[in-house]
From Swiss-Prot:
It catalyses: GTP + H2O = GDP + phosphate + H(+). Interacts with AFDN, the C-terminal domain of RALGDS and RLF, but not with RIN1 and PIK3CA. RLF binds exclusively to the active GTP-bound form. Strongly interacts with BRAF, but only weakly with RAF1. BARF and RAF1 association is dependent upon the GTP-bound state. Interacts with RGL3. Transmembrane segments: none annotated. Alternates between an inactive form bound to GDP and an active form bound to GTP. It is linked to Noonan syndrome 8: A form of Noonan syndrome, a disease characterized by short stature, facial dysmorphic features such as hypertelorism, a downward eyeslant and low-set posteriorly rotated ears, and a high incidence of congenital heart defects and hypertrophic cardiomyopathy. Other features can include a short neck with webbing or redundancy of skin, deafness, motor delay, variable intellectual deficits, multiple skeletal defects, cryptorchidism, and bleeding diathesis. It comes from Homo sapiens. The gene is RIT1. GO terms for biological process: Ras protein signal transduction; signal transduction. The keyword Endoplasmic reticulum does not apply. InterPro entries: P-loop_NTPase, Small_GTP-bd, Small_GTPase, Small_GTPase_Ras-type. PROSITE patterns: RAS (PS51421). This is GTP-binding protein Rit1. One of its GO terms (cellular component) is plasma membrane. Residues 197-219 have a biased composition (Basic residues).
Length: 219
């Protein structure tokens, strides 16, 4: 499914300084298809062989909801253990795609470990996350139901997709959804700050009430 992603240097590039950069991190057990998803998104190409222990970084410039976006995507190795390098990209990342394979129940169970790893570093449950069940084309090998994925996404309060990197099903949707989550949470944070900085009308009215009474008594 192609929703219009274009590589860097396409007609979608925006004037210098206007494109917002989004730092996205791919997480998940080895062999679930993180690299295949990323490469399909970036170059519309399915890698026939890839070393799951290699970490790669990719960049692409696209438009999402008619807004330009520079995506800086880190495709991590599949180990969930805590390391100094992982601590750095957990802090720097603005949004996370946590992947499992619908053909591998163990990879589904490891999703919680990656979610806990995000919380361990960032100390907040409000970090933008998208949950992905990959390899949806391998229905005959399915070990994790779609309902289980939906239930876990509800627990995480995040978007959920079942994808096929092999056939490019819903690949663009995943990355677009994560950028939308980042934008939404940024807007919520700005509104919260604006609300906090404004004096509450009820407090202001209460402070003014004695002066109003004095004025009324004088007249």
């Amino acid at each position: 499914m192609d929703s219009g992603t274009r590589p860097v240097g396409s007609c979608c590039s925006s004037p210098a300084g206007l494109s917002r950069e989004y730092k996205l991190v791919m997480l998940g057990a080895g062999g679930v298809g993180k690299s295949a998803m990323t490469m399909q998104f970036i170059s519309h190409r399915f890698p026939e062989d890839h070393d799951p222990t290699i970490e790669d970084a990719y960049k692409i410039r696209i438009r999402i909801d008619d807004e330009p976006a520079n995506l800086d995507i880190l495709d991590t190795a599949g180990q969930a253990e805590f390391t100094a390098m992982r601590d750095q990209y957990m802090r720097a990342g603005e949004g996370f795609i946590i992947c499992y394979s619908i053909t591998d129940r163990r990879s589904f169970h490891e999703v919680r470990e990656f979610k806990q790893l995000i919380y361990r570093v960032r100390r907040t449950d409000d970090t933008p996350v998208v949950l992905v069940g990959n390899k949806s084309d391998l229905k005959q090998l399915r070990q994790v139901t779609k309902e289980e994925g939906l239930a876990l996404a509800r627990e995480f309060s995040c978007p959920f997709f079942e994808t096929s990197a092999a056939y490019r099903y819903y690949i663009d949707d995943v990355f677009h959804a994560l950028v939308r989550e980042i934008r939404r949470k940024e807007k919520e944070a700005v509104l919260a700050m604006e609300k906090k900085s404004k004096p509450k009308n009820s407090v202001w009215k209460r402070l003014k009430s004695p002066f109003r009474k004095k004025k009324d008594s004088v007249t």
